[in-house]
């Protein structure tokens, strides 16, 4: 059996799931800049930094994925003190995560990976970290927290990035507590010795990790099965899910036939963090009552969504639901009512994303509209397009407008790959819209002046700014309509 019928699965069940994540919490930092010269000191490029952003990394990215899917999350681990530790704790707290199990060790570095981006390329990565195993005293403190939390949770995820938190003794204790409480322990492994994960319910290595840890070069189905069998024996796990990149993933259980799920991504832009999405959706699906085969198929579907996004990304319930129902994600998941949009943007803002807002009628989409949207998208990380409802278009443009009704206009805008979210608003809701979106930048066409843009005072009050996009041509919807009425094609 290669596929599982997952189309009827209710992803809203994820919202009632409680998860404990134990592992190596990190900060992923990005320095975005421009390169225009070579240093006079050495033959290296000079990056003029324009923007700095940061987000949760490592086990923290698992937390990002879980919260984006609506789960309630607690974390346990060890971090350093200072600014990096405060930043890590602050980002977790902002997501509504219970951080009581996150210990502070002033003598330990909080893992921070700084990527320098210039000319749209990663030029350098700087790592600040400690790989030293945590002390037995710290292990016992985490165990006490876990003993209190696990009976209240539906699932435990151990995310190992090899930074010293998931010691052998801690893994042994977690396995015992989970077994006693009857809760699943899902492990994203690291390193060559999987015997430290003995007692795990399921382990989720990728192809390279599975090959290295098993000592079996995976080059076909037979070698894949040998590697899986060896790792199941070493780890004593009930299941192993091996992710295979473009070849999907494979689920193995002792004494059962392998279950293969083929990759679903239509296009792949970035595989960063896809493994964190897999373990998150796999775990939540199991917690929500799915079988392992269904959970694996759901995880595969979610992975297909995130790899089509640029950068380390997450998937939310709306996107996953739309994909499961074979509906265009562009329309079903991008269109959000204002309050739902506000919540989605708050999560992205906490991840350091720069939010761009543009608004308009978009009645008879033309070259000027396309240019506005394309140029707006280049200014940040997330583009929100607010579309005037039919009554607002009528008020602004007069009787006989809109030519294209609201529902169709929304579908057309949503179909553009550079657009992340679409919302519908009325003219008298503009202030409410801006306060909900809190854009870093509000864009309008070049036929305006900044102080003529409606809502500019609120944008500036909230710390944003207005950017005018020069018109690419003199075409307009009004002119097109007039030409048609005058019989000119």
UniProtKB/Swiss-Prot annotation:
Chain residue ranges for the region called Cytidylyltransferase: 357-489
Catalyses which reaction(s): D-glycero-beta-D-manno-heptose 7-phosphate + ATP = D-glycero-beta-D-manno-heptose 1,7-bisphosphate + ADP + H(+); D-glycero-beta-D-manno-heptose 1-phosphate + ATP + H(+) = ADP-D-glycero-beta-D-manno-heptose + diphosphate
Presence of keyword Nucleotide-binding: yes
Record GO terms (molecular function): ATP binding; heptose 7-phosphate kinase activity; heptose-1-phosphate adenylyltransferase activity; phosphotransferase activity, alcohol group as acceptor
GO biological process: ADP-L-glycero-beta-D-manno-heptose biosynthetic process
Cross-referenced Pfam families: CTP_transf_like, PfkB
GO cellular component, one term: cytosol
Record key words, sorted: ATP-binding, Carbohydrate metabolism, Kinase, Multifunctional enzyme, Nucleotide-binding, Nucleotidyltransferase, Transferase
Keyword Transferase: yes
Ligand binding (ATP): 206-209
Active site residues according to the UniProt entry: 276
Catalytic EC class: transferase
Region listing for Ribokinase, in residue ranges: 1-328
Subunit-structure text: Homodimer.
Annotated family: In the N-terminal section; belongs to the carbohydrate kinase PfkB family. In the C-terminal section; belongs to the cytidylyltransferase family.
Name recorded for this polypeptide: Bifunctional protein HldE
């Amino acid at each position: 059996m290669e596929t599982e019928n997952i189309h009827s699965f209710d992803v809203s069940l994820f919202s009632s799931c409680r998860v404990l994540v134990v592992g190596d919490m990190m900060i992923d930092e990005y320095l975005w800049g421009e390169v225009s010269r070579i240093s006079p000191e050495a033959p290296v490029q000079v990056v003029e930094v324009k923007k700095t952003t940061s987000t949760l990394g490592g086990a923290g990215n698992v937390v990002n994925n879980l919260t984006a899917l609506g789960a309630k999350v607690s974390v346990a681990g060890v971090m350093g003190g200072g600014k990096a530790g405060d930043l890590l704790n602050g980002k977790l707290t902002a997501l509504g995560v219970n951080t009581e199990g996150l210990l502070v060790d002033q003598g330990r570095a909080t893992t921070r990976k700084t990527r320098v981006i210039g000319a749209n390329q990663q030029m350098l990565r700087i790592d600040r970290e400690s790989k030293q195993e945590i002390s037995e005293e710290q292990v016992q403190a985490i165990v006490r927290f876990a003993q209190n939390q696990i009976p209240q949770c539906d699932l435990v995820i151990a995310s190992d990035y090899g930074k010293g938190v998931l010691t052998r003794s801690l893994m042994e204790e977690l396995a015992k507590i989970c077994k006693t409480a009857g809760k699943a322990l899902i492990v994203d492994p690291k390193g060559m010795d999987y015997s430290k994960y003995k007692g795990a319910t399921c382990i989720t290595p990728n192809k390279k990790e599975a090959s290295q840890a098993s000592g079996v070069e995976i080059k076909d189905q037979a070698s894949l099965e040998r590697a899986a069998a060896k790792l199941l024996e070493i780890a004593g796990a009930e299941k192993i899910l091996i992710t295979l990149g473009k070849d999907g993933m494979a689920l193995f259980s002792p004494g059962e036939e392998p279950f293969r799920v083929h990759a679903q991504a239509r296009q792949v832009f970035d595989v960063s963090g896809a493994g964190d999405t897999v373990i998150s959706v796999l775990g939540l699906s199991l917690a929500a009552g799915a079988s392992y085969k269904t959970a694996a198929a759901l995880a595969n579907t979610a992975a297909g969504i995130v790899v089509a996004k640029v950068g380390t990304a997450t998937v939310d319930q709306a996107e996953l639901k739309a994909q499961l129902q074979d509906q265009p994600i562009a329309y079903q998941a991008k269109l959000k009512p204002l309050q739902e949009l506000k919540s989605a943007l708050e999560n992205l803002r906490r991840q350091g994303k720069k939010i761009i807002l543009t608004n308009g009628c978009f009645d008879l989409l033309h070259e000027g509209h396309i240019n506005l949207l394309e140029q707006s998208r280049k200014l940040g990380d997330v583009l929100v397009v607010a579309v005037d409802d039919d009554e607002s278009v009528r008020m602004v443009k007069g009787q006989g407008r809109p030519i294209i009704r609201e529902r169709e206009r929304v579908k057309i805008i949503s179909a553009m790959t550079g657009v992340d979210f679409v919302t519908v608003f009325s003219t008298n809701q503009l202030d409410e819209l801006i306060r909900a979106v809190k854009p870093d930048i509000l864009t309008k066409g070049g036929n305006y002046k900044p102080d003529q843009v409606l809502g500019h005072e609120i944008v500036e009050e909230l710390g944003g700014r207005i950017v005018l996009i020069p018109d690419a041509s003199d075409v307009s919807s009004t002119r097109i309509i007039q030409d048609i009425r005058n019989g000119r094609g």
